From Swiss-Prot:
It comes from the Bacteria. InterPro entries: P-loop_NTPase (IPR027417), RapZ-like (IPR005337), RapZ-like_N (IPR053930), RapZ_C (IPR053931). The lineage of its organism: Bacteria, Bacillati, Bacillota, Clostridia, Thermoanaerobacterales. It comes from Desulforudis audaxviator (strain MP104C). This is Nucleotide-binding protein Daud_0300. Keywords: ATP-binding, GTP-binding, Nucleotide-binding.
Length: 294
């Protein structure tokens, strides 16, 4: 377990453990939900022995484990005696907030015997009291939005790179084949001069320098690119602040062969210069070899 970070996520039902674990997954943690406490030492040992060593583990342990949960304090003592280092993240919220969340989700509290939500909350607070006292970090999510909780988790458990971890994909496509279903933003570049109507350029693609020169030489292109890069200089930090981890930019022309390819590659170059993580993919390039794919 040397060098392996073991994070135990626990806390009140409805306090945001599910959202926290999703964020931890985005940060590269290997996450397991509702693992019986007695299995924690063996699980950690197996992770340390894997060929591709798992360096960060997050385990959700809470009262859903029923009678198994009663062993959690003893298990934590055993981990400490064995020299296995761990951290405990405890999430909680006010009764008022938890009641509202349970009503919105229309789910019963797991410890409520009479159907009264507050009864279940108070019973859970009592059951978790000792575990809360061992927590390395307690987060009260009463006034947190999901995005704010994700940002807090990233600040606590992500490195500097993780805090600005946004995986960007720029996809060129042809409108004749449909807009990519996973697109977050769609940019229509069909207003730019079309190389398809130049006989010497028609058989080429946006990967070829003559096509790139043709597209970039147009005054309209120059003005558009200036606006486009300013747009993303503004948008990307906002997405990161909001906790977004993936962003798909779809850039389309008629057939996905010329203009969209040029612009997707250009955008990739610009964002890499700004130290963003971006992959460029040309979805429809080479899809139609009949000469109609423009």
């Amino acid at each position: 377990m040397a060098g392996t970070r073991l994070l135990i996520v626990t806390g009140l039902s409805g306090a945001g453990k599910t959202q926290a674990v999703r964020c931890l997954e985005d940060l590269g943690f290997f996450c397991v939900d509702n693992l019986p406490p007695k299995l924690i030492p063996k699980f950690a040992e197996l992770c340390a022995q894997t060929t591709g060593k798992i360096e960060r583990i997050a385990l959700v342990v809470d009262i859903r484990g029923g009678e198994f949960f009663a062993t959690v304090l003893d298990v934590l003592k055993d981990l400490k005696n064995q020299g296995l280092r761990y951290e405990i993240l405890y999430l909680e919220a006010s009764n008022e907030t938890l009641v509202r969340r349970f009503k919105e989700s229309r789910r019963p509290h797991p410890l409520s015997t009479s159907g009264e939500i507050v009864e279940g909350i108070e019973a859970e607070r009592l059951a978790l009291r000792e575990l809360r006292g061992l927590a390395h970090k307690i987060i009260d999510t009463s006034n947190f939005s999901v995005a704010q909780l994700k940002q807090e988790i990233a600040n606590l458990y992500g490195g500097n790179e993780d805090r600005e971890r946004l995986a960007i994909t720029a996809v060129s496509f042809g409108y004749k084949y449909g807009i990519p279903l996973d697109a977050d933003l769609v940019i229509d570049v069909r207003f730019l001069p079309n190389p398809h109507y130049e006989p010497q350029l028609q058989p080429l693609t946006g990967l070829d320098e003559p096509v790139r020169e043709y597209v970039f030489e147009a005054p309209t292109t120059s003005e558009f690119l200036s606006h486009l890069v300013n747009l993303f200089d503004f948008l990307i930090p906002q997405y990161i602040r909001e906790g977004k981890t993936t962003l798909t930019l779809a850039i389309g022309c008629t057939g996905g062969k010329h203009r969209s390819v040029v612009l997707a590659d250009w955008l990739g170059e610009q964002l890499r210069e700004r130290k963003h993580r971006i992959v460029v993919r040309h979805r429809d390039l080479g899809r139609d070899v009949s000469g109609t794919n423009y």
